[in-house]
A protein has these predicted regions:
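Generic N-terminal leader/processing signal
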Residues: 1-2, 15, 311
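Bacterial N-terminal signal peptides that target proteins for export
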Residues: 2-10
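Bacterial N-terminal signal peptides
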Residues: 10-20
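Residue-level hotspots at or immediately adjacent to binding/recognition sites across diverse folds
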Residues: 25-377
Length: 377
């Protein structure tokens, strides 16, 4: 990404277990399909609040709503080769301001764009010139301070930082040395998570060890920590989220052909990413593409690993340790306790990404433009 008589204790334990299971089941979310007005695959989603949400996908397409998803407006970012370019990550800042990250077959297809007028026009802020670079994801601490992460090139991560929301500078010299073949996965735009004023975590795979790269000072210095997730050319950590500076969850696994449940893996950390422990097996049949807490305290805007600025309505339920995972064709699930127990979302399949503004307002996006609103009681 473990007195009273024994008989009395056993039955009391069973009673508490049954109550806990019933209570958790009663918290099953309400799932509401929404019409995105596109048939393109949607890969990443970023709620700003309960009303404003941005999502992006193939064909350089973006969609945005300002009414909580009742209506969605579609558009195309004018990328270098729009038909062949995919938008793999998005950071919503407001109904007018958003950033997107593009990838493609050409070196220059990897780029960052920004709009300040709701998607009417877009400005290219960065265009890749490094052969072999593959920018998987980005995340922001503030509306103008963010980090973009790439697969390694010749043992170096050519990562980028912006401190003004306009220009991007290399921090390759700050990054820890890469393992042979070390890379990340652009499955949902959540391979990097930000928190507070300078904390960030990057999930990797592709090599002999799946690692977390971590910084506490905005990318000036980094440490690398091993995780127990499987790793290999198509295996590792895909998605990472932190609910505060200490507690986080990591999702991933293997993309090998088949439907074995053990292809999906999740792990948690309670020391800022230094050590990780596998959770119980998630009930999905494919590598976890995305993991998101219901109440985020990281970054700017909602968007998976970014901070929802709106407040959830008052609820007797403590959602602190709740998280939702998506696994494309393998299904989706949620946990109320960071992976000790899991509940499958029956019939939910084909979704790549999930993100929450608050527990009552979350969105999944995926194949054929599908959007599903996720609302916990």
């Amino acid at each position: 990404m473990s007195k009273r008589t024994p008989a009395v204790f056993f039955f009391v334990a069973l009673a508490f277990m049954a109550f806990g299971a019933a209570a958790a089941f009663s918290q099953q979310p309400v799932l509401t399909p929404q019409n995105s007005n596109t048939n393109q695959l949607l890969i990443a989603v970023s709620p700003v609040d309960e009303n404003v949400v941005w999502a992006v996908g193939t064909g350089s397409v973006f969609v945005v709503t300002t009414d909580g998803g009742n209506t969605w407006r579609t558009g195309v970012v004018p990328t270098l080769n729009a038909g062949d370019v995919q938008l793999r990550d998005v950071q919503g800042v407001s109904d007018e301001v958003a950033y997107v990250l593009s990838i493609g077959n050409l070196t220059g297809d990897f780029a960052i764009y920004k709009t300040t007028d709701g998607g009417t026009t877009w400005t290219q802020q960065f265009q890749n010139q490094l052969i072999g670079a593959f920018y998987d994801c980005f995340a922001f601490w503030t509306p103008t301070n963010g980090i973009a992460h790439s697969d390694s090139v010749n043992g170096v991560f050519p990562d980028l930082i912006t401190t003004d929301g306009m220009t991007w500078q290399s921090i390759a010299n700050n990054m820890p040395p890469a393992l042979s073949g070390e890379a990340s996965f652009s499955s949902s735009g959540t391979c990097v998570a930000t928190q507070g004023s300078g904390n960030a975590w990057i999930a990797t795979g592709g090599s002999s060890i799946a690692r977390i790269l971590a910084t506490t000072d905005g990318g000036n210095t980094w440490a690398a920590y091993d995780t127990p997730l499987a790793s290999g050319p198509i295996a590792g950590g895909f998605s990472v989220a932190f609910r505060d500076a200490t507690n986080g969850i990591l999702g991933g696994g293997s993309l090998t052909t088949g439907t074995a449940v053990d292809q999906a893996q999740a792990a948690t950390s309670h020391d800022g990413g230094q050590t990780w422990q596998l959770t119980n097996n998630p009930p999905v049949a494919y590598a976890i593409f995305c993991v998101s807490y219901l109440s985020n305290t990281t970054g700017v805007g909602g968007g998976g690993q970014h901070d929802g600025r709106s407040q959830a309505k008052r609820s007797p339920t403590d959602y602190t340790r709740y998280a939702v995972i998506t696994a494309d064709i393998g299904g989706a699930a949620w946990t109320p306790d960071e992976g000790t127990t899991w509940y499958a979302l029956s019939g939910v399949t084909g979704y790549w990404a999930v993100a929450f503004a608050n527990p009552q307002n979350g969105w999944m996006v995926g194949t054929n433009g599908t959007i599903l609103k996720v609302s916990f009681p």
